[in-house]
Amino acid sequence: SDLTPADEERVRAALPEVGLHFVFVDPAMFDGFPESKRYPRQIYYRIAAPLLLPDTLERILYLDADTVIINPLTQLYAAPFGDAYFMACTHTRKLLEKLNAARLGMDEAAPYINTGVLLYNLPALRADLDMERVRAFADKKQDVFLLPDQDILTALYGDRVHLLDSMVYNLSDR
């Protein structure tokens, strides 16, 4: 949201072989969301992505900036969603799922979503994603958040995630 036209031009010049489309994000969309120095409002962009991106897109793959890609992602990107909203990895065991469910006020435990590698089912999310619901949940639970974006996605959509093999798609030291 704070990129200037000059910034955009520098990025385009650095990557002439890549087609880029910049999306303006209205900061007002996130008014009232809890923020901190460590977790600014931009963390909510990945939650709101289905509403911010063109309707012509049916899926997107989000990768954290520190993700190292060593194999093609073609098979992952083309994988069928079934009724899942996301494909992602988890790095928690069953006991931690129960603790996270209690911490986040969930009725039932669900896998804790690691958002470092996140494939989105955009049509399904567009039909169900309610940013007011996200804002209300974030406001209510902000005092117990550990990783706000992951906490929100787990609590609100953890039952709609297709788990990926973390040894293949999101190996982590956590």
What are these regions (language model features)?
Residues 24-28, 42-96, 119-120, 126, ...:
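GT-A fold catalytic core of metal-dependent nucleotide-sugar glycosyltransferases
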Residues 91-94, 110-174:
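Catalytic core and acceptor-binding pocket of nucleotide-sugar-dependent glycosyltransferases
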Residues 7-53:
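Active-site-proximal specificity loops/subdomain of glycosyltransferases
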Residues 2-10, 97:
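Short, charged/polar "capping" segments at the starts of alpha-helices
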Residues 36-40, 95-96, 140-141:
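Short, flexible loop segments at the rims of nucleotide/cofactor-binding pockets, characterized by
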